[in-house]
């Protein structure tokens, strides 16, 4: 009704204002398109909340009420403050109590509450997302990385993630990607973590991965995912399926190579510990090597590592477990997953993502970093504000796991709404930090 009335009023006004009907219709379409999409998205979010209301019935009544009020994502934390500051203040006090803050502590927004995983205590719940820099030489982080990550740590976030740090030269996405497979890499990262720990109160996490079939490509601004014009290296994946028609076809990784790469992940994990990282993350998303096993769009194997979800998860879980065993028990470890391939039932679905998250949690994951897509060029993502947060909500509230929301989250208001509603435990923000 709101959409129909507002659209009718807008069209009537334009017909009155414009000299011709065609001009009025053209302007109407341009002006209303974005607002219509926003309203449709809000309506869809609201409908889905009520359809899945059982998911939220175990929430505390305070959080359940907040979740219902903000279900459409049109009403935010600060909107509620304007409407009922007393109630929101009591809700924020409740959240502080859940975070372990004393009753006499000054009132603060959810994003400024502490969060603990194993022995790592974060001062707040804002995370700097992994952002590729393409500035390493032979995998070595240098002054650029020191300044970039040092500035992000000084900026106030509780936790800073590195860009994907690769386990081998062949496992790099581009020639500019950093690594953890040589002593020079370890020394470069140690220099960086020492700065973070001595000059800031942030923690730092190393995201570790292997490019798989998306490797041997140009640095971002020279053509994302485009193959190198020269100096290419061989790539491998779960199956011999090229990323796109322009990329080379990877070789199907053999059992011996799987064992070798798993050992490289362990070596990188040990280096990350010696380099002073507080936390590590296995990158099992976005179509890279580990992700290529999980998604049926890139895994057509007929052995024990293909077919059912349990089979497709076999090697990713072997890698994760080996890393977890090599990583100190008092330090946390997360995993990034693609919770939706955006190709319907042909790929990983949100329902499967719940099972994937549970499997990693059973292997020792302390946090599920919930991303989506980038697993196939055929994906049809539905973009918008906080567009991946519903997957974090799904996994957190149906699997009962700690999650981190990421994806087009760019305001403090977004972060507070996500946290207060119980849609995630941490919120990762990228470009706004820049």
Predicted regions and their residues:
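Helix N-terminus capping/helix-initiation residues
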Residues: 20, 60-65, 84, 142, ...
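C-terminal domain-closing interface element
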Residues: 47-69
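Conserved beta-strand positions that form and line the central face of beta-propeller blades
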Residues: 27, 48, 304
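Flavin-dependent oxidoreductase catalytic cores
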Residues: 87-434
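C-terminal auxiliary extensions adjacent to catalytic cores
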Residues: 63-101
């Amino acid at each position: 009704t709101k959409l129909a009335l507002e659209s009718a009023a807008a069209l009537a006004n334009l017909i009155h204002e414009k000299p011709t009907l065609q001009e009025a219709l053209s302007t109407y379409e341009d002006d209303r398109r974005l607002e219509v999409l926003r309203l449709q998205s809000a309506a869809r979010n609201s409908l889905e909340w009520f359809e899945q209301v059982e998911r939220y019935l175990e929430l505390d009544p305070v959080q359940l009420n907040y979740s219902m009020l903000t279900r459409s994502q049109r009403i935010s934390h600060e909107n509620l403050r304007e409407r009922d500051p007393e109630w929101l203040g009591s809700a924020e006090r409740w959240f502080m109590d859940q975070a372990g803050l004393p009753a006499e502590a000054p009132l603060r927004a959810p994003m400024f509450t502490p969060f603990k995983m194993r022995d790592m205590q974060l001062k707040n719940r804002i995370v700097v997302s992994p952002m590729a820099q393409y500035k390493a030489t032979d995998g070595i982080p240098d002054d650029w990385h020191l300044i970039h990550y040092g500035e992000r740590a000084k900026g106030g976030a509780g936790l800073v993630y590195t860009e994907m740090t690769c386990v081998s030269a062949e496992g790099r996405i581009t020639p500019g990607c950093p690594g953890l497979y040589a002593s020079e890499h370890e020394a470069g990262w140690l220099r960086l973590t020492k700065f973070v720990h001595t000059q800031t109160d942030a923690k730092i996490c190393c995201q570790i991965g292997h490019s798989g079939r998306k490797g041997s490509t140009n640095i971002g601004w020279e053509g994302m995912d485009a193959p190198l014009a020269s100096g290419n290296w061989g790539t491998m994946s779960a199956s011999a399926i090229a990323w796109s028609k322009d990329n080379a076809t990877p070789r199907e990784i053999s059992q011996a190579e799987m064992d070798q790469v798993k050992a490289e992940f362990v070596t990188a994990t040990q280096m990350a510990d010696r380099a002073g990282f507080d936390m590590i993350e296995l990158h099992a998303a976005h179509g890279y090597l580990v992700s290529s096993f999980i998604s049926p769009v890139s895994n057509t194997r007929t052995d024990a590592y293909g077919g059912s979800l349990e089979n497709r998860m076999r090697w990713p879980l072997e890698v994760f477990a080996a890393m977890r065993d090599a990583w100190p028990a008092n330090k946390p470890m997360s995993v990034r997953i693609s919770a939706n391939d955006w190709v319907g039932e042909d790929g990983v679905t949100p329902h499967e993502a719940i099972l994937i998250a549970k499997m990693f949690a059973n292997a020792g994951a302390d946090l599920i970093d919930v991303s989506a897509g980038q697993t196939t060029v055929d994906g049809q993502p539905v973009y918008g504000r906080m567009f991946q947060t519903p997957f974090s909500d799904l996994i957190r509230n149906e699997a009962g796991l700690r999650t981190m929301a990421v994806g087009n989250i760019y305001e403090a208001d977004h972060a507070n709404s996500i946290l207060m509603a119980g849609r995630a435990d941490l919120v990762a923000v990228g470009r706004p930090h820049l």
